[in-house]
Amino acid sequence: MTRPHSFDPYLEPWLTSRVPRMAEYRAQLAEFREWVLTDVDAQANYTDRYAPPALETYDRHGEVVNRIVTNRWYEEQHQDLYRRGIIGLPYVEDAPHLLTFAMGYLLAQADISLHCPVTLTGAIAYVLATHAPDSVRQRYLYDVIRMDGQAKTGGTWATEQHGGSDVGATTTVAAAAGDRFALHGLKWFTSNANSGLAVATARPEGAPPGSSGLGLYLVPSHLEDGEPNHFRIRKLKDKLGTKGLPTGEIDLLGAEAIQIAPPPTGFKLMMEALEYSRVHNAVGSVGIQRRSLAEALAWARTRRAFGHVLADYPMVQHELLRMRVQFEAGALLAFEAAIAFDEVQQTSERRTWLRLVTALAKYLTAEWAIVASRSALELVGGNGYTSDYPVARLLRDAQVLTVWEGPANIQALELLRLLAPRYQGWEQYRARLKGVLDRLPDGMANLSHALEQRLQGDTEASRITLRDEQSSQSYARKLLHRLAQSLAFALLCETAGEAYLRGNSLPAHSAWRFYEELDPPAFGAENQAARRGVLELLDEPELQAVGKR
């Protein structure tokens, strides 16, 4: 049974064992989760179906107002998130960033359209707190970390019409204007387009081409005298999902901006902001996995067909088992990145590992979120295809998670960079998996052998990929997929080993079940003990209750 004040029966014990301080926030997270899965979930459904944001260009007197109107429920909950400290706690109370990543994971189970602006606001807070000049930090940081219901929300403006990932080709120009800059250009895809503060990439006049010529600038929505800044929202995007999130095209018409970093540092700082956002993307993807599993399980436990509830049928059980084990693997992978983010705040020696694990986690969890939401919709059937059930929204919203903050090919290129000798990424990856291998108990020989074989295969795959430029370009994405899966398996093995020493064999069943997905046994030769073991996890009362709300 679920312990009182448990925010997640699977993740909570793992997080508190890795970061004991997280036990202090158990009740706070449990209350946050209850609010998210009731009030926020209801708002998300309402906003998605009936009250998405709208662009108001002129007021009733014909004056240009150029503002985005969101419904009051969305707006109130957006501010309530900041009031609850989803951005401010690490700065106001010195909480670990891991706490706010856990809050993001819970929030994503109900509303990705709120999780996105929270992520962007957090990225701005991080850049201001760690890299902005003292005068800029003192003037603007409080605006995004305050917890009194008056916080300004954030945006990151990098994508231009020529493409999102090729930031080095930025055409926005930053012209010096006294102690500030005037930005001219078009930002093509701006999430949370009604943000109070945004960071934008731009090229100062006379700067060289490419990413080395980019500076990073803070763009307030309003000037010091209260007048709107000099930019125009051209339109709101009509999107497949995240209907509650205002995403726009913004013309910068001499927008007043404050320099955070000149070239060549500007691009580097935007990439650090992306690191933060990619971790949130990963935990948000796992939130979608978790909610999809809950909806599928609740339906399977109650829906009857051909005289039996769906959950009694082996084919349905197989699908639920796969969803459960992939959720566990995704959760460990995403929060491995979240923990690494906090470690980097203590020592820069962990930055290569942060970048590497974040690329792996961002890629694989986003893929799995789509698989999980699609599986939930298929299991619920025709009802799931309607807006009366949340799985349709989950599926639509999940699609963007592979695109936000860099698609798979971009993560693969990041992996290639980190595996180069300069960064020692392969050595750190191998050391992490070898460390798990060395600590596995003697009674887990099967898992130990499987992980050792997996690491040997990773070594060969990396050698082939890195042998020359053509191989790197051909195999980078396949290597990304393989290493992400291997790391997820290693984390499952690590958790299983710790549980085994406490007399709990269920995590070992999950790890073996996951391994059988990576290296399928002969037809009909699946480990039935592992299958029965994971089935026990589907009896978790708390998990079933989510889907019944």
State where each predicted segment sits.
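A short core secondary-structure module
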Residues: 180, 184-230
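Conserved phosphate/anionic-ligand binding catalytic regions in large, soluble enzymes, centered on
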Residues: 112-119, 282-285, 289, 367, ...
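Glycine-rich phosphate/cofactor-binding loops in nucleotide/flavin-utilizing enzymes
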Residues: 2-15, 383-446, 512-549
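C-terminal helix-coil-helix/basic helical segment that borders enzyme active sites and/or dimer interfaces
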Residues: 328-362, 377-378, 463-474, 494-500
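Extended, charge-enriched "interface" segments that sit outside catalytic cores
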Residues: 1-93, 543-549
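Internal helix-loop-helix
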Residues: 59-150, 191-193, 404, 500-503
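A glycine-rich, basic-preceded beta-loop-alpha segment at the flavin cofactor/substrate interface
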Residues: 225-230, 234, 239, 246-277, ...
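C-terminal amphipathic alpha-helical interaction region
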Residues: 439-549
